[in-house]
């Protein structure tokens, strides 16, 4: 349902007033923007045909930017601008002129003209449009109130080197993830870069002689590389109503680590607990936690850790005493199908949809096996494997999000055939996880068993038992929310963008499983990828189940903590690489005006004005799932 049109309590001023001009006592009112009804969001798969431009862009963009960065440093011209003539010079680096022509057809040299190749520090000057939500809401009387802590998602936090072994020295205190230094290292010193990014397979910690740590401060996650913003628009809009470093924190972390290792190596959860307690004391206000993607899993784990005896030792009322609200943005609380593909073969939609020349170039530089080998050492990535079994994700003949599909089921996460002449075997999520274990080494299997659980608790007694088991804390289908009747939870995510739901696999000539990109059906399956509605990373099922059903039950929400669900339609601008201010894609939603309105309302103490709103078919989907007994 759509919310009412914006209403304001006073006439809009042309200029932003200062805090002296506008009394804090003024009570603001603001209605969130209207959105189309559910009927306007149908036929998601057909929309994917509107433009082929974006199919390969994300992955190719990373590759071409890296090649440009490597070439720049190789020639040593600090003032180089990548005009077409210059681009032609490094086309040979790809080993295929056809590949380069393919990539070049998508990218203009203007993409690179403002790239600050001599610095890692991005421009931080916000434009008026980027902070308009904050400026308008400041004019309407909204002010900073509760301290705010932001918990970024997977790969969002920059990682910088603190090592002094031979190849590390040139990169000391430079980011090997999340900067132009990363791209330089990837292309000019790939082996050194891999040695830093990969973790020890047995311990899940740093390899000997390597020390890579999460960058700190707002710069850790505001931009990935220059021009590619992540949290910057949220930070800017919060600042517009009075937030600054004394009442706002970006709690960056090393997303490669398992959650137990985050505490063991970095004392991440201990430091997060201390900052929350400090904020309560100094500001005499509870904290608002804002998380995105994997950050929502980290936050949920923190809720269990902080109250547990022998861990955070906060006691059973700590969350209720210290947390005002939890804003869960596009949270991967029950995992994502694309994690299976990333760990199984080092692939996902962006790589599967490259043409043969692009695949050749990518494989020549950074092969599937190398990518899979790297991510399998990262316990944090494995935390996003799907949870809930066939009850949640379905089987070969049924899935809760099949809805009106009659000849095809989303329940087969993997459809696998050894060679082109055979039929595909269909694997549900449990089979797919076993298939993954069959092709990985013992260290990976031990890491999974030690840190994570993927089941579903059927009784309250089972939930209470699981609450005492750290390996279960990652899974909201096996453990419960803390007893926090005063805390409010807001679940916000995008809908209306084709998203990975399953995969067709075959074997390559070396006998390794790879996505079978030859499979297409013209509607739902593209290059071996089964697509469904979602935000481009997480399908609707993963985005909406926990907040709309799991946390609506006493078993998983014993204090009846308030849950507000708000969906935002993905409405990308046609000629904007990031989709523009109406994009609700998994990352781009952080710049969406409606999301920023919600964040400012909640943090300023007006979260009660945020309504529930549904655009997708999530209510129909969750009605197909029975959490009280296993399927026959």
Swiss-Prot record:
One of its GO terms (molecular function) is O-acyltransferase activity. Keywords: Acyltransferase, Endoplasmic reticulum, Membrane, Signal-anchor, Transferase, Transmembrane, Transmembrane helix. It is an enzyme of class 2 (transferase). GO terms for biological process: diacylglycerol metabolic process; lipid droplet formation; lipid storage; triglyceride biosynthetic process. GO terms for cellular component: cortical endoplasmic reticulum; cytoplasm; endoplasmic reticulum; endoplasmic reticulum membrane; perinuclear endoplasmic reticulum. InterPro entries: AB_hydrolase_fold, LACT/PDAT_acylTrfase. The chain crosses the membrane at residues 57-77. Catalyzes triacylglycerol (TAG) formation by an acyl-CoA independent pathway. The enzyme specifically transfers acyl groups from the sn-2 position of a phospholipid to diacylglycerol (DAG), thus forming an sn-1-lysophospholipid. Plays a major role in triacylglycerol formation at log phase. Involved in lipid particle synthesis from the endoplasmic reticulum, promoting localized TAG production at discrete ER subdomains. This is Phospholipid:diacylglycerol acyltransferase. It comes from Schizosaccharomyces pombe (strain 972 / ATCC 24843) (Fission yeast).
